[in-house]
Amino acid sequence: MIVDTFTNRGSTFFSKLSTVLFFLCAVITFQGVIQRREVELDTPVYVHYAKYRSARFYHAFRNVRQQYAQVKFNMDADLSELWDWNTKHVVVYLVASYSTEKHEKNQVVVWDKILSSPEESKMFMKDTLSNIQAHPFNEYSNQFEGKNATYTLHWTVSPKMGFLSWGAGPGSYEIPFHKIITQPK
């Protein structure tokens, strides 16, 4: 019986290789947890207005008229501090926070963008409208009237190896929702 066959040597080699790679991944993940840095970015978002109207979207799960809001904003942000050697991509999103009678805190994503490289992390956006098709911002009580929302820029850093990290910039001042009155044709 031959003990040192090609199959046995290959099995031993790949067993040791997978063990080394496993411990290397564990060390990198542990290092990411230890060296996790809290990044404080001053990235204000200036919201011009938040408007709403009644509409019926047939692709929605309920075929009823609902109030949908749309937000127009400016943003000048430099998120390059979020990048290091282990960053795969950064997801940036604008969150509207408001309260209702039933719920103390409601948070809705009204805009998002995936940054795949550090060059994309310098963002200058002027008069940008939230996409009502990608992020339908509706209130199930159908009462945007009299409500104010605070808008905050959030980010999630996805590492190549390790755990997600996230953060948020300063919130804007409260912006009231304005109703759009459509003229009959």
Curated annotation (Swiss-Prot):
Keywords: Endoplasmic reticulum, Glycoprotein, Membrane, Signal-anchor, Transmembrane, Transmembrane helix. Residues 1-12 are cytoplasmic. It comes from the Eukaryota. Pfam families: SPC22. Signal peptide: none annotated. Its main location: endoplasmic reticulum. Glycans are attached at N148. The chain crosses the membrane at residues 13-34. The keyword Transmembrane applies. GO terms for cellular component: endoplasmic reticulum; signal peptidase complex. Disulfide bonds: none annotated. GO terms for biological process: protein targeting to ER; signal peptide processing. It is found in: Endoplasmic reticulum membrane. It is a single-pass type II membrane protein. Residues 35-185 are lumenal. Essential component of the signal peptidase complex (SPC) which catalyzes the cleavage of N-terminal signal sequences from nascent proteins as they are translocated into the lumen of the endoplasmic reticulum. Essential for the SPC catalytic activity, possibly by stabilizing and positioning the active center of the complex close to the lumenal surface. Essential for viability. Component of the signal peptidase complex (SPC) composed of a catalytic subunit sec11 and three accessory subunits spc1, spc2 and spc3. The complex induces a local thinning of the ER membrane which is used to measure the length of the signal peptide (SP) h-region of protein substrates. This ensures the selectivity of the complex towards h-regions shorter than 18-20 amino acids. SPC associates with the translocon complex. Belongs to the SPCS3 family. This is Signal peptidase complex subunit 3.
